[in-house]
């Protein structure tokens, strides 16, 4: 989805940003959907 791409672009592709990416996804959807994992 475009929202996920925007989150990834904003956080970059560094593995150290994984928690920040997951927090953004959870904030967007209210949970972390299986298809995102």
Swiss-Prot record:
Its EC number is 1.12.1.2. Binds 1 FMN. Its cofactor is FMN; [4Fe-4S] cluster. It catalyses: H2 + NAD(+) = NADH + H(+). It is an enzyme of class 1 (oxidoreductase). GO terms for molecular function: 4 iron, 4 sulfur cluster binding; hydrogen dehydrogenase activity; metal ion binding. The keyword Protease does not apply. It is found in: Cytoplasm. Keywords: 4Fe-4S, Cytoplasm, Flavoprotein, FMN, Iron, Iron-sulfur, Metal-binding, NAD, Oxidoreductase, Plasmid. Subunits alpha and gamma of HoxS constitute an NADH--oxidoreductase. Tetramer of an alpha and a gamma subunits (flavin-containing dimer), and a delta and a nickel-containing beta subunits (hydrogenase dimer). Belongs to the complex I 51 kDa subunit family. This is NAD-reducing hydrogenase HoxS subunit alpha. It comes from Rhodococcus opacus (Nocardia opaca).
């Amino acid at each position: 989805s475009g929202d996920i791409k925007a989150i990834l672009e904003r956080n970059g592709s560094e593995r150290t940003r994984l928690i920040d990416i997951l927090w953004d996804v959870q904030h967007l959807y209210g949970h972390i959907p299986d298809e995102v994992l």
